[in-house]
Each structure stands twice: as structure tokens, then as C-alpha cells.
Amino acid sequence: MGRGRVQLKRIENKINRQVTFSKRRAGLLKKAHEISVLCDAEVALVVFSHKGKLFEYSTDSCMEKILERYERYSYAERQLIAPESDVNTNWSMEYNRLKAKIELLERNQRHYLGEDLNAMSPKELQNLEQQLDTALKHIRTRKNQLMYESINELQRKEKAIQEQNSMLSKQIKEREKILRAQQEQWDQQNHGHNMPPPPPPQQHQIQHPYMLSHQPSPFLNMGGLYQEEDPMAMRRNELELTLEPVYNCNLGCFAA
């Protein structure tokens, strides 16, 4: 005897209705997953319970992409078949579409913050965990890249400073070598000629003409030695020559 056709109608018992909803929802999600895997199809499933809880499934967790694709396709089809009188209606639908998209983004944001997770199924929680893990991997990769670039920059600066220090040290050593060679050459010259080091340059002083005229002058001695005349002796001779006529003049006056 064949099985009779079951009549579809609302289940009056709340407990039975909730149990049936849970079983059928799980079966529906399973069928959506099977068709997406077997047929390589993009599937998006959205279910609201009688209490307003949302249950969804999407291929590879790309619900937003599938909905945007659906909206673009539906909007393009409506634009082709809709008359000009339906422009206001289209704007109203566009508003509702954007509003629904905003609500979806806000809900995803709450999920990313760890809020409002009670209404999510184990599959949805697993998808959310995968998304967070992927985001953490991207964050760690970017952080490591910035740290690596910072380390390379510091190493480059360190190398430049070391090269500059080496160049300055080499210049100092060369300068010390030159000064040491000059000092040794000067010491050898002083040792060979027994001469003191040259005095430092002095400023020229202006001398009185009298001092210039009474500089010691050389004279030739009878012995053949070249000597310089004593300036005091020259001064004394000049005084004697100057006083002798005066003394003679006085003697002549007394004699008269």
C-alpha cells in the first residue's frame, strides 16, 4: 500500500513547529551546500524564523557578493521592462536595497566584534572564525612587513654611520702621520745643524731714526779679524768730539 500525500499546513503545536523548523532548516542548509559543491554553483540562502532570528548560508562566505550580483541583475532586468511611470517605484526599491545592505553590514560588524552570536548556527560560527583568522593573517603579515622594512632602514643608517666613522678615522690617522713626519724631519735638521727652531713671526716695529743711525757697524781690526764696533764706544767718541771744541773755546777766553 502506497504512502499517502502529506498535506502541508501550519503546525499548531509550538514545540512540534520548532522541532520541525530546526530539522527542515538543517536539511535545507545541507541541500544548499550539496548543490553548491556538486554543481559548482553560487548559492545564497536566507531564512528567518517566526521569532525573527536570521539563518543564512552562502557559498564560500560571500553572501554580500551574491546579493550584490542579484541586485544588479534584478535592477537591470527591471530597467529593461519597466515603463517610465515606474521610476519612483524603482527608487523606492533601490532605497530598500541599500537599507537592507546597511543592516547586513551592521550585523556583520557586530559579529566581528563578538556581539549578537546567539542566533548563529555552528556553520555560521565556523565561517566567522575563518574570516577572523584570515583577517588576523593579513594583519600579522602587514605588521611583519612594516617591522622588516623598519629594520632594513635602521641597518642601512647604521652602515652609513660606520662608513662615515671609518672615513673620519682614516683622515685623522693620515693627518697624524703627516705631522709626525714633519716633526721627525725638523728634529733631524736641528740635530745636524745644532740650530734652534725658527722663532715665531713677529710684527714689524717702527724704530726711531736715531736708533737706525746708531746700529753697530762692523770694522776691520789690525789683526785681520772682522769685528763689530761697540755702540757704547761709538757714543763715547761722539761725545768727546762734541765736547772738545767747547773746552778749547773756554780756555781761549780765559787766556785772553
From Swiss-Prot:
InterPro entries documented for this protein: MADS-box/MEF2_TF (IPR050142), MEF2-like_N (IPR033896), TF_Kbox (IPR002487), TF_MADSbox (IPR002100), TF_MADSbox_sf (IPR036879)
Source taxon at top rank: Eukaryota
Region (Disordered): 184-206
Keyword check for DNA-binding: yes
Gene3D superfamilies the UniProt entry points to: Transcription factor, MADS-box
Localization (cell): Nucleus
Main location: nucleus
Domain K-box positions: 88-178
Pfam families: K-box, SRF-TF
Signal sequence coordinates: none
Xref: SUPFAM superfamilies: SRF-like
A cellular component term, taken from the record's GO annotations: nucleus
Keywords (A to Z) from UniProt: Activator, Coiled coil, Developmental protein, Differentiation, DNA-binding, Flowering, Nucleus, Transcription, Transcription regulation
GO BP field: cell differentiation; floral meristem determinacy; meristem structural organization; positive regulation of transcription by RNA polymerase II
Domain (MADS-box) ranges: 1-61
GO molecular function: DNA-binding transcription factor activity; protein heterodimerization activity; RNA polymerase II transcription regulatory region sequence-specific DNA binding
Role according to the record: Transcription factor that promotes early floral meristem identity in synergy with LEAFY. Displays a redundant function with CAULIFLOWER in the up-regulation of LEAFY. Required subsequently for the transition of an inflorescence meristem into a floral meristem, and for the normal development of sepals and petals in flowers. Regulates positively B class homeotic proteins.
Subunit organization: Homodimer capable of binding to CArG-box sequences.
UniProt-recorded name of the protein: Floral homeotic protein APETALA 1
Source organism per UniProt: Arabidopsis lyrata subsp. lyrata (Lyre-leaved rock-cress)
